[in-house]
Design a protein with these regions (language model features):
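The feature captures the beta-strand-to-loop junction immediately N-terminal to the Walker
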Residues: 36-38
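ABC ATPase nucleotide-binding domain helices that frame the ATP-binding cleft
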Residues: 44-47, 143
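Helix-to-loop junction immediately C-terminal to a conserved catalytic motif
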Residues: 51
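ABC nucleotide-binding domain "signature motif"
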Residues: 57-67, 213
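ABC ATPase nucleotide-binding domains
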Residues: 75-79, 83, 87-233
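Glycine/charge-rich catalytic "coupling/switch" loops of P-loop NTPases
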Residues: 224, 254, 258-281
Length: 281
């Protein structure tokens, strides 16, 4: 059964640098929740901490109602798909997919059943007897996904899983990930620096910068209503014009700029008359 993930006031420092700085968020069951941000913003450090692969200095992690802060990784019942697929070259596709089940002492017959079911989900059952070197990059990614799904986790963690694929394959795998998410109903926590990936796949996005979450919302809301200059610049191509707030008339904010007077949305801009602001064009 899919479970929500809750992160409360997590801090992780490397020396004097706070890689994760008092971060809190909560997903809902079955949500595809993205951690989006530039390199070095702390998103992968945070994801690894959720998985139990990295310790934090303070904070709490919950999976559903279960506190998992000190729970070892193999007992959290989350599965992780890494940037590097980490497939055993000497094993077949099915053997790779069922490897984790073997570590859990699942019987051979049940392992095969669950492994083939996972391969069916990613449309790779017909290639169960192949070795990884006989597969394309996209097929190897599907095998890595199937290996995670075979564990029947409460949540799936993905660390930039499409970054090693070419542009065409990335587009194809985005569609596959959306289909798999809809079919399984799993809670997915997904890390990426790719804005298009996040905006096209996510139910909600947490935008990170310098170890902090600066904005959370649906992709459309973040794109059309960025909460800061950083969000506007990072989430899309935009021209930022410096201006001064004048007044709101007929539901539109009027901003005086070097280009002249601009009439902007939204009308509920929390600005005082004469206050400096940025306009996204």
């Amino acid at each position: 059964m899919s479970q929500p993930i809750r992160v409360e006031h997590v801090v992780k420092r490397f020396g004097a640098v706070a890689a994760v700085d008092d971060v809190s968020f909560a997903t809902v069951p079955g949500e595809m929740f993205f951690l989006l941000g530039p390199s070095g913003c702390g998103k992968t450090t945070l994801l690894r901490a959720v998985a139990g692969l990295g310790e934090v200095d303070s904070g709490e992690f919950y999976l559903g109602q279960r506190r998992i802060t000190e729970t070892p990784p193999h007992r959290r019942n989350v599965a992780m798909v890494f940037q590097n697929y980490a497939l055993w070259p000497h094993m077949t596709v099915l053997e790779n997919v069922t490897f984790g089940l073997g570590l859990r002492k699942i019987g051979r017959r049940e392992r095969a059943k669950r492994g083939l079911a996972a391969l069916e989900i990613v449309q790779m059952a017909s290639l169960a007897d192949r070795k990884p070197n006989q597969l394309s990059g996209g097929q190897q990614q599907r095998v890595a996904l199937a290996r995670a799904l075979a564990l029947e986790p409460d949540a799936l963690l993905l660390d930039e899983p499409l970054s090693n694929l070419d542009a065409k394959l990335r587009l194809e795998m985005r569609a596959e990930l959306r289909r798999i998410h809809e079919e399984t109903g799993l809670t997915m926590l997904y890390v990426t620096h790719d804005q298009k990936e996040a905006l096209s796949l996510a139910d909600r996005v947490a935008l990170m910068r310098d170890g902090r979450i600066v904005q959370v919302g649906a992709p459309r809301d973040l794109y059309h209503r960025p909460g800061s200059r950083f969000a506007a610049a990072f989430l899309g191509e935009t021209n930022l014009v410096r201006g001064t707030f004048v007044e709101t008339v007929d539901g539109r904010a009027r901003i005086e700029t070097p280009m002249g007077l601009l009439k902007c949305r939204p009308s509920d801009v929390p600005l005082a008359r004469g206050q400096a602001c940025d306009v996204c064009v």
